[in-house]
Amino acid sequence: MREYKIVVLGSGGVGKSALTVQFVQCIFVEKYDPTIEDSYRKQVEVDGQQCMLEILDTAGTEQFTAMRDLYMKNGQGFVLVYSITAQSTFNDLQDLREQILRVKDTDDVPMVLVGNKCDLEEERVVGKELGKNLATQFNCAFMETSAKAKVNVNDIFYDLVRQINKKSPEKKQKKPKKSLCVLL
């Protein structure tokens, strides 16, 4: 079974943990408890293939940013999360993306831009068009989600698996060649 290393990044309080826990455990975490680093594993089926996702839920707070380079180096796909209710969280994404591209040393990195908390429409300050435009600029997928209302949560991770598969298809294991041996 192929394994996928997915890293969830974004500012503090945008709902990275809520999205991850909703996907992995199907529960919504109501209280905010800043994450240092949590790792989750979940087996899913995407396009008929069994996949093991290893999801790294990272710290959004500044004091843990030194660990980011390591996450980015090992990650195969990235979820960049902002809150539609906080402009500053949207503004932080440019630097995060640049850091990913620098660490990976390529522009072709599987990535999904996620505007979370779409259930809080009345508190929206970041328009959907802004998210779409940034995703176009980043050349990546875009989704608005709600961990609370379970909107598009699974789609984020399935989309990333498909992007990773497209970028680096799994190589079929070749059977070792058998050679004939003659003993005299």
Curated annotation (Swiss-Prot):
Top EC class, one word: hydrolase
Binding site for GTP: 10-17, 57-61, 116-119
Lipidation (S-geranylgeranyl cysteine): C181
Entry annotated with the keyword Acetylation: no
Enzyme Commission number(s) from the entry: 3.6.5.2
Keywords: Cell membrane, GTP-binding, Hydrolase, Lipoprotein, Membrane, Methylation, Nucleotide-binding, Prenylation, Sensory transduction, Vision
Chain positions of motif Effector region: 32-40
Catalytic activity: GTP + H2O = GDP + phosphate + H(+)
Residues excised as propeptide: 182-184
GO molecular function: G protein activity; GDP binding; GTP binding; GTPase activity; protein kinase binding
Recorded topology in the membrane: Lipid-anchor
Modified positions (Cysteine methyl ester) in chain numbering: C181
Residue ranges that the Swiss-Prot or TrEMBL entry lists as coiled coil: none
Family note: Belongs to the small GTPase superfamily. Ras family.
Function summary: Ras proteins bind GDP/GTP and possess intrinsic GTPase activity. Plays a role in photoreceptor cell determination.
Annotated protein name in UniProt: Ras-related protein Rap1
Gene label: Rap1
